[in-house]
């Protein structure tokens, strides 16, 4: 009978602890090292684009099941393969400059969310340079010891707003 009582107390204590953990809000951890790694991944993708490297190289950090929302398509784009094939179509413009403003990384274990304002310059087919501005979010997950981009949302912002 004593073992049953001890077990019951342990089970009750464990249940209470579990309920307290479930009710506790999750807060992002401050991790400057992970924040630097995540921001560097976005910047390296931009550098690869500006250098004109192949799309496979530009998309090397995308997960196979990558998804994206952007201002060019009204639907969810699904898959690294789709993203790479769409990027291989010769664009009418070229990235000349890309920068991250107000970057913030929230870390939740093996998940990191990068939120920032994108400020870039693109040269159009007519040779004119125009700003490229967006409110952006990227979600990275650590897979096999490497950070992989699993989702992105790029919301264009009109110049001057």
Language-model segments: what does each one mean?
Residues 2-15:
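Bacterial N-terminal signal peptides that target proteins for export
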């Amino acid at each position: 009978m004593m073992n049953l009582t001890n077990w019951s107390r342990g089970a009750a204590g464990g249940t209470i602890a579990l309920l307290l953990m479930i009710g506790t809000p999750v807060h992002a951890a401050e991790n400057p090292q992970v924040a630097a790694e995540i921001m560097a991944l976005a910047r390296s993708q931009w550098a690869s684009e500006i250098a004109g490297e192949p799309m496979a190289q530009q998309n090397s950090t995308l997960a196979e099941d990558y998804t994206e929302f952007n201002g060019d398509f009204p639907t969810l784009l699904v898959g690294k393969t789709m993203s790479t094939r769409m990027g291989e179509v010769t664009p009418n413009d070229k990235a000349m400059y890309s920068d991250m403003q107000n970057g913030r990384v929230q870390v939740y274990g093996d998940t990191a969310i990068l939120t920032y304002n994108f400020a870039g310059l693109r040269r159009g087919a007519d040779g004119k340079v125009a700003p490229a501005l967006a409110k952006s979010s990227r979600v990275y997950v650590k897979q096999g010891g490497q950070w992989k981009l699993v989702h992105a949302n790029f919301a264009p912002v009109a110049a001057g707003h």
